Amino acid sequence: MNMQDAYFGSAAELDAVNEMLAAIGESPVTTLDEDGSADVANARRILNRINRQIQSKGWAFNINESATLTPDVSTGLIPFRPAYLSILGGQYVNRGGWVYDKSTGTDTFSGPITVTLITLQDYDEMPECFRQWIVTKASRQFNSRFFGAEDVENSLAQEEMEARMACNEYEMDFGQYNMLDGDAYVQGLIGR
């Protein structure tokens, strides 16, 4: 299983790719076999990049404010898993595939650490508004890079704006925001 398949189930990814193809007036496909179509390969690549880009901002559905990361008992190393998009706060970073503590200058830990973690969620586990935003933004970039149809661009830009607004509404409803100290994302920025 490759990395992109881990976050898009084949049926969900096929649906998303077909939405992208439909946006540019192409016929749907029945398989994600990239050998048969450059359009499918390009659509998948853009879709997965946009998915990571949007999720990496950190949202109520993919921020874990008290994730416990446990080191390997023999090496003391904590792997920085592919699903980890970032650790907020600035103290811990990904260095060579391992969690690295910048304040102590080491990647070896004697015990578990608790962090605020942004993780890449499976497509099917995301709120609908985020799925729509990802597919619409990916469709727009797909059109822009490979076809350049201006009328399609304008239509997709409007749809993307509406999808993003729906995501912002979702975030206001489900995020834990307050005037005094903000959310986990704001705390991460403050800690930099």
From Swiss-Prot:
One term under GO cellular component: virion component
Compartments where located: Virion
Keyword Hydrolase: yes
pH dependence: Optimum pH is 5.5-6.0.
Enzyme Commission numbers on file: 3.2.1.-
Enzyme kind, highest EC tier: hydrolase
Subunit structure: Homotetramer.
Entry's family note: Belongs to the tail tubular protein gp11 family.
Function: Structural component of the tail, which functions as a receptor binding protein (RBP) and mediates the attachment to the host capsular exopolysaccharides. Displays a depolymerase activity that specifically degrades the polysaccharides of Klebsiella pneumoniae capsule, which allows the phage to reach the host cell membrane and bind the entry receptor. Hydrolyzes maltose. Does not hydrolyze alpha-lactose, beta-lactose, trehalose, melibiose, cellobiose. Displays amylase activity.
Protein name: Tail tubular protein A
Organism listed in the record: Klebsiella phage KP32
